[in-house]
Amino acid sequence: MRIVFDIGGSVLVPSKPDVEFIDKLSYELTKVSEDHEIAIVVGGGKTAREYIEVASKFNANETFKDYLGIQITRANAMLLIAALKERAYPQVVTDFWEAWKAIQLKKIPVMGGTHPGHTTDAVSALLAEFLGADLLVVITNVDGVYTDDPRKNPNAKKLEKISARELVQIVGKSTSKAGASTVIDPLAASIILRSGIKTYIIGKKDALRLFDVIRGKHEGTTVEP
């Protein structure tokens, strides 16, 4: 299979880099890459949001703040490249053609953000579409799609299986401002819908058993085309 992994920045760097988790995740990704072609996109997470918040105090515009966030995503991507060692393409990949070329070289391409207005969720979905991926795996700090934000509403229920169209409806009211944080952003959901990409949305626990996840055995949400 060809698989794209979308890894939230706050998963890797909750307040500071989670060295143990990054090490274990890189091992899982390396093992999966032995039997499958994989590509990775890393988000900016809490660190990017903090930088963007400070930039807002200086009246930076949304495009400037998007560029600032992109730099943080690429710093996080470099951390993962370091952990993946020789299995990774040695520098952060910045466009989809370069990602494709890295795969042909039997290396794992690791990307961050690319363009203002596109979250790394959207980059992941676009990359999966471009590469003709069989599967998109979204790793977040929320272990699936819920009826409401489980961090704010204790009565929110996890949805084990939904359609891509239902995903679009659920996330459709999310903000598109720089640094916005949702389980997946509306643009990414729309790309998943149009591309018919099977998607798993999982949390950190499942991220440490990726062989099970790619076979459909996980505790997150399956998004069917």
Swiss-Prot record:
Keywords: ATP-binding, Cytoplasm, Kinase, Nucleotide-binding, Pyrimidine biosynthesis, Transferase. Its EC number is 2.7.4.22. Gene3D superfamilies: Acetylglutamate kinase-like. It comes from the Archaea. ATP binds at residues 9-10, 45, 49, 140-141, 146, 149. One of its GO terms (cellular component) is cytoplasm. Inhibited by UTP. UMP binds at residues 44, 66, 114-120. Pathway: Pyrimidine metabolism; CTP biosynthesis via de novo pathway; UDP from UMP (UMPK route): step 1/1. GO terms for molecular function: ATP binding; UMP kinase activity. Belongs to the UMP kinase family. Catalyzes the reversible phosphorylation of UMP to UDP. This is Uridylate kinase. It comes from Pyrococcus abyssi (strain GE5 / Orsay). The gene is pyrH.
